[in-house]
Amino acid sequence: MAAPQNYLAVIKVIGVGGGGVNAINRMIEVGLKGVEFIAINTDAQALLMSDADVKLDVGRELTRGLGAGANPAVGRKAAEDHREEIEEVLKGADMVFVTAGEGGGTGTGRAPVVANIARSLGALTIGVVTRPFTFEGRRRANQAEDGIAELREEVDTLIVIPNDRLLSISDRQVSVLDAFKSADQVLLSGVQGITDLITTPGLINLDFADVKSVMSEAGSALMGIGSARGDDRAVAAAEMAISSPLLEASIDGARGVLLSISGGSDLGLFEINEAAQLVSEAAHPEANIIFGAVIDDALGDEVRVTVIAAGFDGGQPPARRENVLGANSNKREEPAAPARSSAESTRPTGGLGSVPPREESPAPAEPAPATASGESSLGPVSPPHVPPARPYQDTQAEELDVPDFLK
């Protein structure tokens, strides 16, 4: 008689570089189940502190275990030199999450290589990465943009979480340590929001094939999380998820949506229906919405909603990226007109992305307030508000960056 086989989806979460390894440490700490953790780093000392199931110290000859020095080229070379080892630990995976903090050397340079290997082995490959805080310096911001663009080419789906947006949902007294912990928590939510749909038996159950149908070759994805208690809690949590400050754009036009609703045993059918309806109205009319509901008595009277939207026309929602700061307000109104007014109302958050230009060259800093408070005649000038994206490519001013030996 044939031995019984394990038909569970094999999910592996790979933390690449310092930020990625910190993120999987957080996932292990909170007890994320049903996945295997792999830590990959050029910093041998940081690897020693990880609780991952598998640890790969790559670039031993290249860096002697001392890190990549915030140089993505070093991180990339280290990964290529150990390609066979990485292939070995990824074999047999149905789904691979590549998580990293973009902007440094190891995560930025190595994540695309790891993703390329995972995808070549036939695994559904999802990147979940953070964009660095503004205070981490221009060099990291520029390296992060290059790394994100490169990673997008190697994964099925890419979720980018801008760390600066965490400040908009944090207390002004938040410490730097807590800010980075918040970033780890959001990376956890991104991975958990997907894996729980597959690994946790639910009231309305989903499987790996459901998730794959939405996320395979989906391009950029947006993730929103929300929780609420009291009256209309499910709708409030869903509203919070689709208008989350973490979203870089609106989910309008998403052709694939993963929706997970978790609540206690008192979670009502009509509550679920109302929350799901709210999300479906925000997505494309013909969107493939994969929906799951999990009963977790540990939540008490709290309802949690996780929304992951993908499958945008063109692979990503680029039209909104320049107006991302107004995305929260835009969702409930017309997509084009309110973008300018909401950018005004969220000026404090917007300032985060404009700090470096203001320090280096006062000239761009002057028009910035003018555009925000200006008349509609200045409207057309608003979209080319791309300074944070890539005007610093050739600059060598790195005084804001952290010294390489600390990486």
Curated annotation (Swiss-Prot):
Residues 381-390 have a biased composition (Pro residues). The gene is ftsZ. Gene3D superfamilies: Tubulin/FtsZ, C-terminal domain, Tubulin/FtsZ, GTPase domain. This is Cell division protein FtsZ. GO terms for cellular component: cell division site; cytoplasm. It comes from the Bacteria. Residues 336-348, 368-377 have a biased composition (Low complexity). It is found in: Cytoplasm.
